[in-house]
Amino acid sequence: ADGQNQVKLRGVVHFDGRYLANDDPNDLSDTWPATRIRPIIEGTVGGIYDFRFTPDFGQGRTVIQDAYVTGRFNPSFQVTAGKFKAPVGLERLQSAHDLRFVARAFPTSLAPNRDLGLQVGGKLVDSRLDYAVAFLNGSNDGASSETFGDVDINDDKEWAARLFAHPFAESDSFALRGLGLGIAATYTDQDGTVAQPLLPSFRTPAQSTFFRYR
């Protein structure tokens, strides 16, 4: 009753209708795919440790989207370990529950999705400044670590960092109160191979590839 220990069960299901005009039926088919089928188990232990486990059965495959534990030791110091969203893309960090459309915008494909690693973050300056620094296996732009079977295929790792400010959080103006300014970046130095080039390809919401590296 005090919220120190709790478990929540919920989920999200998204269906997408893909009907394309003048397309090559050998390349793309008109279809109703289940893009997300995600039962979610999350909770809190001891009022400090939060956990989340999210399998995904959408798109005809089984993937573990989230599997992490967060220690909320202090509002300014929280530690997350496991598989979680890299602290980079703004839209990517939004929950699938809160999206206005089933598919995210193209710029989100330029940022990594979920990865395995360790993250330190928190809120500073009366919660007006959020920060996060993560040490990760490394994943392609727009992709998650399951691209490589949720294992690292080399010794090189990736750093990701993010700062996001709410300078007018206490303003009387509704428009200013919701204004946020942020910056995020990643750094890695990894060499691919012919079998694993470590280069992403980019697709439209209809899953038609419109760009790939050579």
Annotate each language-model stretch with its function.
Residues 174-214:
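Detector for outer-membrane/organellar transmembrane beta-barrel domains
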